Amino acid sequence: MTTGFDLTVEEQLAILMSREVNDWETSACGALSFIPATAMLLGREMRAPNAEIIILGSRDYSPFVTGKDFHFHAQRGQLDLFFISAIEIDQHGNFNLHVIGDRDEPDVLMPGQYGTGMLYYAVPRIVMFRTEHTRRSFVDQVNYVSGAGTSPKGVSRRTREVKVITPMAKLNFNQESRIMELGSVHEGFSVDQVVENTGFNLGIRGEIDTTPQITEEEVHTLRTVVKSHMIDSETYPNEAANLIREP
C-alpha cells in the first residue's frame, strides 16, 4: 500500500480511515487521537465538505467543556461515526484498552477507555484501528473486555456497522454471525499474510477484495492542506510536523 509514496504508517492509516467520513454526518474521536483526527480532516477535504468534526481536547474542534458533555451528546444520538484505537481485538468484536494478562496482577496496565465502551453502544458506525497487524493484537479472546462487540437480548444498541483498519487489511464485523471477517487486503499484502498474522478465523468465503489504492491526490492533500492546517490550528501540531511527510 505504501509503494510509490513512501508513506508512514500514520499516513497510510489516516488516508484509509478518511474514506469512512461521510458528508452531512458528525464524526468524532477522543483525546490523544492524532491518526483519526488527521483522517477526519482529510476526509472533509477530499469528499465530505459538510461533515461535522469533533476532536476532543482540540482548540477548534471540541465544542464541549468536559468529556461528560461529549458522552451526553453521543447518548442523545448526535454522533454518526466514532474512531477507537484498541490494543487487543478479538473475533467477537470485543476490544481491550485496560490490561494484558491477569486482571488483578496484570503484565501491562493501560490507561483505560474513558467511556469508549459506552460509545461502542451509542454510535451507529465504529471504526477501530491498530498501527500493527499481529497475533498479539488480534487475539481469539481479549484479556479484558473494555468494549463488548455484542449485546444481550433486550439491550438497546445503536451500533450497526463496525470496521477495523490496519496496515495490512480491513476487517468487517458481521452483525448476523457476530464474527469479525476479512473485508479487503491492502496492496502489497496477501490473504495468507493477513491470516498468518491474525489469531482467529477470519471467516473467509470466496475471493477477498483488494482495498482501493491510495491515490496521489489523497497523499498530496494530506501532506499539504491537512498538514498545514493541523499545524496552524494547533491540532496535534507536533505530530503533524513529524509524522506527515513533506510533499
Language model segments and positions:
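Short, surface-exposed, charge-dense and proline/glycine-enriched linear segments
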Residues: 57-64, 84-85, 116-118, 233-247
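N-terminal active-site beta-alpha-beta segment that forms phosphate/nucleotide-binding
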Residues: 1-67, 78
